[in-house]
Amino acid sequence: RIGGRLWLKYKRRPFHTGISAVAALALTSLLAVGIYHAKRPSADGRLLMWKIDSRVLLRHPLWGVGPGNFAGAFGREQAAYFAEEERPRQEQLVAGCPESGFNEFLQFGAETGIIGFVLLLSLTGTAVVGAIRRRNPFGYGLFGAAVFACFSYPWSVLPLRLLFVVLLAAACTPRNAPHRGLLRNLPLLLLPVAGAACWPGLYDRYAVRVEAQRQWREVRLWMHSERYDYLVEDGERLYGTLSEDFRFLYDYGYALHKTGDYRRSNVVLQQGMQLSSDPMFHNIAAKNYEALGAYDEAERALRQAHAMIPHRLYPLYLLARLYAATGRSEEARTTARRALNLKLKVESVQTREMQEELQKLLHEPTVQTQPESCNE
């Protein structure tokens, strides 16, 4: 109907309508460019994430990477992207390790494959268009929720995810649907009953997980006192409950590393790599490999960590020291120079200390001391 009205207006006053359309398009373009330049780093970061999201989807087109495995696949794909060729400096600086894809449709497609991606887009698009044509106000609500989902991660919040489902169902329901008998409405009536029946089991699992997270937060305080043996003891007890929590897996794997259980640490860290795009999992795994004498595996892990987020100094720092410790002096110097020439996104006391160590490494490539920890 809106299109028909615009067409009639164009037929009556074609020149005036054409000028108005061009002016509106130009104004919209200028506004978009202005917003982009006002928030350019954020916009470039979103564009890079959408690019990596799409690559994950295309690399796993049939069944996707599976629900819950998106972040790990994102980190691996971003590493492959930066390892393929020298990328623009701006892209390297905005690279990060997000927990979500900042586009729910692309993330859903990456987790479920192209079939799930097309089904979700088709269902949402059909519901929006149909509801707006029927003048169903829920169509506009669903459209707003879909636009929001294209630029953020609302489905990571359970109430917003449920809201999208409710809007989708309401938009698909005709406003003047005929009254149906009780028997025909029986499936809809049984739906909340089934939900109520499932609720106790779901709630119990959720409550157990929340309690385990609370206990781990208390135990984690011992990390500041370097009592990693306490973390290992409780980590083993809570591992079964929190095995899908990447933050727990990193803390537990790091505690195992600090207590010298390098093989067990790598098992836990490998599991965390499937759930997270944080390169610190690879950095600690590399230190475990080095302690076990597996220098080739340590080198591969550090190269992977650097490729995941190229503007971080820590992986190159560890790699230079690995080369120095294994007698590869020239490679140590080359890597140290590369690290010192790196344009850092964030500078800190830790990065300055590492740069000082790298300067010494250029003249003393066999330095053996290593930092205890580093967030960079």
Outline where the language-model segments fall.
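Alpha-solenoid helical repeat scaffolds
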Residues: 216-217, 247-251, 280-285, 314-318, ...
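Short coil turns that delineate tetratricopeptide repeat
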Residues: 243-244, 276-277, 310, 344
